[in-house]
Regions:
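Conserved, well-structured interaction surfaces
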Residues: 1-46, 63, 67-71, 80-95, ...
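Short, surface-exposed recognition loops and adjoining beta-strand edges that mediate ligand/DNA contacts
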Residues: 49-53, 87-171, 274-290
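C-terminal structured "cap/appendage" subdomains that terminate the fold
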Residues: 260, 264-314
Length: 314
């Protein structure tokens, strides 16, 4: 599926090269961002993979060798830097489209993954210049189905439950036999403090057993017309990620734990937790563990956890 997306981006980029069309820069920027998104996910899951920036036939695609680490890094950083230059500051009326902040945010994630925190810090500072985006007052508000594509959402899959354009009940609490396949475990729940208001997003409903906690982050109201669909969106990049990656970049680049904790505390205090100080977190190793736990609490079931643990060496 990822290579299908890459093929489509390459196809559009090949055909629009030199064309005189309206919104040329925006469309090119979107393709560069999406191609980078898919290549980055391939890299994080499989390591170096075959890459191409042009359309190739299926027969020729089989002949492309795996790239090197340097080639993957160059492709991602060049394309995302160009995408950030081309994309507008806001998506306009079509809110599901990406703006330049998406390119800067993904670029920062690439830099952190490749062990370049200073470059990530610079990219995130560019992202934060876009004042159209910011933290919502609570994590729950980010996922309110009546508050879709809010100011915290940077890049999300847009769903609409009408006409079967939702995502079923996969991420909504239900009683189907496989419901617990994506529910939190007791071990994961243990990283939350009891007064953390994000806990309600993974444990809102009555426990039906001592080992089951129901995920309600993507809750949508029941609709008798669309009984098998949920219309809530799925965010892949949101402003809380900008904040916590900036904390990571500060710590890893040697800017000081006090400055890093100042940014980590932004999501903690939003969740109703006390601020951490350098008396609580005394080393870079302790900070990495605290950051991993905070990212786990903030981004539960949003597809970050494994990648975070790998990147942080935990």
């Amino acid at each position: 599926a990822w290579y299908n997306g890459i093929y489509r981006c390459n196809d559009v980029l090949d055909h629009m090269a030199g064309a005189d069309i309206a919104n040329y820069d925006k469309y090119r920027g979107e393709c560069l961002f999406l191609r980078s998104w898919w290549y980055f996910n391939l890299y994080r899951v499989f390591g170096v993979v075959p890459i191409t920036r042009t359309v190739v036939t299926p027969a020729n695609a089989k002949l492309i060798p795996r790239c090197t680490e340097e080639e993957m890094y160059t492709l991602l950083t060049e394309d995302l830097t160009e995408a950030a230059r081309l994309l507008p500051s806001t998506p306009g009326a079509e809110k599901a489209r990406v703006a330049n902040i998406a390119a800067y945010t993904l670029l920062a994630k690439v830099y952190l993954t490749f062990g370049k925190p200073s470059e990530a810090k610079t990219a995130l500072e560019e992202a934060m210049k876009n004042t159209a985006y910011g933290l919502e007052t609570s994590t729950g508000k980010v996922f309110d189905v009546n508050n879709k594509m809010n100011k915290e959402i940077i890049f999300a899959l847009y769903y609409n439950k009408t006409n079967d354009n939702g995502h079923g009940y996969w991420y909504s609490t239900s009683t189907n036999v496989m419901a617990d396949i994506r529910n939190p475990t007791p071990e994961f729940k243990a990283i939350y403090e009891e007064k953390d208001n994000r806990l309600a997003l993974i444990n809102s409903y009555t426990q039906v057993s001592s080992n089951l906690y129901a995920m309600t982050k993507w809750y949508d109201t029941y609709d008798a017309t669309y009984t098998t669909q949920v219309g809530n969106d799925f965010p892949h990049l949101r402003y809380a990620d900008v904040v916590l990656m900036y904390a990571e970049a500060l710590a890893e680049s040697g800017a000081g734990l006090d400055k890093a904790l100042e940014w980590l505390n932004k999501t903690r205090t939003r969740a109703g937790l006390d601020e951490l100080t350098t008396g609580d977190v005394t080393s870079l190793e302790e900070f990495r563990q605290e950051l991993a736990d905070e990212r786990g609490r903030e981004f539960a079931l949003e597809g970050h956890r494994w990648f975070d643990l790998v990147r942080l060496g935990l």
